[in-house]
Amino acid sequence: MKKIQMITPIVEMDGDEMTRILWKMIKDELILPFVDLKTEYYDLGLVNRDNTGDQVTIDSANAAKKYGVAVKCATITPNAKRMTEYKLHQMWKSPNGTIRSMMDGTVFRTPITIPSIHPAVKFWKKPITIARHAYGDVYKSIDIKVDEPGVAKLIFEGESGKREEQVVHTFKGPGVLQGMHNTDASIRSFAHACFKYALDLKQSIWFATKDTISKKYDGRFREIFEEVFEEYKDRFAAAGIEYFYTLIDDAVARVMRSEGGFIWACKNYDGDVMSDMVSTAFGSLAMMTSVLVSPDGKYEYEAAHGTVTRHYYKYLAGEETSTNPIATIFAWSGAFRKRGEMDSIPELMNYADQLEAACFDTLNEGIVTKDLANLMEGVTPVVKNSADFIAAIRSRLEKRLS
C-alpha cells in the first residue's frame, strides 16, 4: 500500500505515563503503516520539561503557531507528590495552560458517542460540546496564605497615574486570599471563536456566568459576548441557530433537561469542571475529543483525559492494561483532517475519516477496553488489552483503506 504523502509537518507534542505508551502504539500500528508522517517533535514529558526549564513547552507552542496544526499527548501537571517522585527542580505550571495562554485559544470538547452506550442523563440524545475559555481566571491567579490579622487590598495603578483601591477583606486571623484577572481582548477572542464554531457546526450556543454576583468581572464577559454577537446575528438567523445567555446555575439545570446538540460556552473553571461531567455522563472521559482553536485559525488537538497514572504503574509492574486509546486516536485523526484541509490533501482527510470509522467499527462489534464494558447495552462486550484493541482497529482500518 502506497503511503499518503504530507506537505507541512504536524507539531507533535509527546507526553507522560500510560498515554505516552499508547502514543507510540498508535503511531506504530495506525499511522506509520499508512502515512509518510511529517512531524516537528517536542518531548513534553515531565522529565524533559524539567531538564529544559519548561522551555520545550514554550517552543512547542511557538511551533503550533508557526505551522497551524498540533497534536498533543496527555501530560502531568506536577503537584507536591510529583515533585518528590520526579525530583523536579520546581513545580512547573500546566503545559496545557501555557500553550492555551500563548495561543490565546478556546478549547472545544465533544463526546464521542456510539449507539450501544447510552448517556447517564436519559434526556440527552445528541452530543454537547463544551467551549472552554482557555485564558486567565483562577488558572492565572495569585494566592496568599495569611497567618495574622491584617487588611487585604485590591490596587490598580494605571499608566496615566490613575489609582484605584478597594479593601478585599479585613482579616481577624489566618485565612487565604486570591487575585485573578482576564482581559477584554481574550474574552473577545473567546466570543468570536465560539460564534464561528457554532456557525461551522450549525449549532446554537449557550453562554453562562454569574453576573448577578460578580457584576463587573462576570458582567464584562456578558457585555463583550453581546457586543460580539451583533456581528454574527444575521448569520445565526440565516443558519437557524441562536445565542442564549443565562446564569451558570440555571444553565446546569437546563442542560440536564435538554436533548443536547448545542455548544455550551463556559468560563475557564466552569469549562474545566463541566467538560468532565458531560464526558462522564456520555460514557467516559476517554471518549471525548478536545481541540484548542486560536483566533487566527491555529489548532491543537489532544485527548480530554489525563495520563492514566494507575494503569502506568501496572504497566511498569509488568501487568496487562486495558487503557482506552480512542480519544488519543481522535486527536491524531483531527490533526490529520485539519492538516489535509489546510494543505488540500483529500487523501489525508479521507485517512482521518477512515481511521475514526475503523474505531467505530471495532466498538460497534463489541470489541472494547475494560472501561467501556459495563456501559454497553444490546451488545456483548469482548474486553481486550490496549495492544489487542489497537490491533483490532488496525485490521478494520486496513480493510477500509484497501
What is each residue range found by the language model?
Residues K2-T8, M18, L22-W23, D28-G53, ...:
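N-terminal alpha-helical transmembrane segments of multi-pass membrane transport
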Residues M6-M25, E29, L154-T246:
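Glycine-rich phosphate/diphosphate-binding loop of Rossmann-like nucleotide-binding domains
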Residues L46-S60, R222-F262, C266:
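N-terminal small/polar loop signature for handling phosphorylated ligands or for N-terminal nucleophile
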Residues V47-R163, Y269-V273:
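N-terminal glycine-rich phosphate/adenylate-binding segment common to multiple enzyme folds
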Residues V255-Q354, D361-E365:
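Glycine-rich phosphate/nucleotide-binding loop
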Residues A317-T323, E341-S402:
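Internal helix-turn-beta structural module
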